[in-house]
Structures are given as structure tokens and as C-alpha cells.
Regions:
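Conserved class I S-adenosyl-L-methionine
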Residues: 1-36, 40-48
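Conserved Class I S-adenosyl-L-methionine
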Residues: 176-239
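Short alpha-helix
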Residues: 157-172, 176
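Class I SAM-dependent methyltransferase SAM/SAH-binding core
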Residues: 51-86, 91-94
């Protein structure tokens, strides 16, 4: 798994200094649910290239970003230097082996497979006084990937958000939750879209031959570019 995320790092979304429209809505909802980051210690589990980590670093007192991918962390540290962010600690580790021996003001994790099961979720709960967790509410729709899934079930989808929500109910842990939706288009060159599709298909256990993928995408390309429509539904848990 580490190798897959290392491979993705070069083309993964990076911190630009400003949150996207979707992320602004996410942060507004987190604030509405009572979490404040000002002057707080934060840990970001599965931080990737630091899109959230670096934004929060500009608000909080200190933040630790943990990820299994050294290449992802390298990108995050490059962007931290670019934006003069110095209150950041990067830790390369999987979540099961991450043992900071402290409790943070806020434990934060968005769209990361690092928190994989109930044992991990309990560990996540114990990491923070407040916790913010975001995961898929249902499988993401991609107009490009649908060309290759051909109606097959995506075995990689894990309904963790609803499972963890039920855990909070069982344990009588008060929480707020909501579903956030996003619809967008992504335009890439034929080669970029080919490599992106191959990565997503491989991680979903739908491996396809590279030339076949490129040929299929060539048939829908316009002037050397392919436009992908993406529809996402995510569940936010704040507690």
C-alpha cells in the first residue's frame, strides 16, 4: 500500500494557500459542530500532501501530520517551506504503529484509509479531546472509471463512516454528523488521465492493461484532453 501512495504523490492535490469551495464548506460545518482550531494542538491522520494539515497549521498552535507515504510527506514539507509554516511535525508511519503517548486537542482524519477498523477507530477517539472524521458515504462516481468498472461491484468500498457512527451510538458517545456532497469536473491530458485511471483501477483491484486503458480514453478525448465528471458523497462525524 505504501508503494501505491508513493506513486500517487507526484500528481496528488497540493496545498495552494486557499481552501477549495468544498473545503470551505467542510470547515464551516466543523465549526458549526463546535470544533475550534485556534491555539490548539492537532494531529492529522493520513495527512497525505498536507492539503488540510497546512491550512490548519495557519490556525492552530501546533500540528502533527502522519502518513505511511514518505513521498506524500515530502510534498507536504516542500509546501510548508513555501508558505513559511514552521509549527508542523511530519511522522512517517502507519496508524497502527503510531504511538505519540499524548492526547491532542483535536484528532483529525479526512478520506484516509489509515483508520481501517473498530480497533483503529477507538485509538483515534483516544488521540483527541475533539475528533473530526470524514469518509465516503457511498462509492464515488467517476465518468472515466465507470468505463472500466462496467457495472461491477467495487470491492474496495468500505462503509466505515456508517459503521463508526453505529459504534458511537452503541458507546453512548455524543456526536454530530452530516452528509457532504461534491460534483466537479477534472480535465487532464490523455496521458495524465490514463495514469490516473490505472492507479485508481489498481487500488480498487480492477487492474487493466495500460494500452487498453489509453485506447479507450483516446476515444473520448478532445484535442488531447479527457474531462472526467466526479460525484462524491461523504459523511462527516464530529464528536
Amino acid at each position: 500500500m505504501k508503494e501505491m501512495w508513493d506513486k500517487k504523490a507526484a500528481s496528488y492535490t497540493r496545498f495552494t494557500g486557499e481552501p477549495s469551495v468544498f473545503h470551505r464548506g467542510l470547515y464551516a460545518k466543523i465549526t458549526e459542530f463546535g470544533v475550534k482550531f485556534e491555539n490548539k494542538s492537532v494531529v492529522d491522520i493520513g495527512c497525505g500532501t498536507g492539503v488540510h494539515t497546512l491550512f490548519l497549521a495557519q490556525i492552530c498552535r501546533e500540528i502533527t501530520g502522519i502518513d505511511i507515504s514518505g513521498e506524500m510527506l515530502k510534498v507536504m514539507l516542500e509546501d510548508a517551506a513555501k508558505f513559511n509554516i514552521s509549527n508542523l511535525t511530519a511522522v512517517q508511519s502507519d496508524f497502527k504503529n503510531f504511538n505519540p503517548n499524548r492526547v491532542y486537542d483535536v484528532a483529525f482524519s479526512t478520506m484516509s484509509p489509515a483508520i481501517a477498523d473498530e480497533e483503529d477507530f477507538v485509538k483515534f477517539i483516544n488521540l483527541g479531546e475533539k475528533r473530526v472524521y470524514l469518509w465516503w458515504n457511498k462509492p464515488r462516481y467517476s465518468s472515466v472509471l465507470e468505463l472500466f468498472y462496467e457495472g461491477s461491484q467495487r470491492g474496495c468500498f468500505k462503509e466505515k463512516a456508517n459503521f463508526f457512527e453505529e459504534y458511537l451510538r452503541r458507546e453512548n458517545i455524543a456526536f454530530n454528523s452530516c452528509v457532504l456532497e461534491e460534483s466537479r469536473e477534472q480535465k487532464r491530458t490523455l496521458e495524465e488521465m490514463t495514469q490516473n485511471a490505472l492507479w485508481h483501477l489498481e487500488i480498487a483491484n480492477f487492474t487493466h492493461e495500460e494500452n487498453a486503458v489509453r485506447s479507450r480514453l483516446q476515444s473520448i478525448a478532445q484535442d488531447g484532453y479527457v474531462t472526467e465528471k466526479i460525484v462524491s458523497s461523504m459523511k462527516l462525524l464530529v464528536f
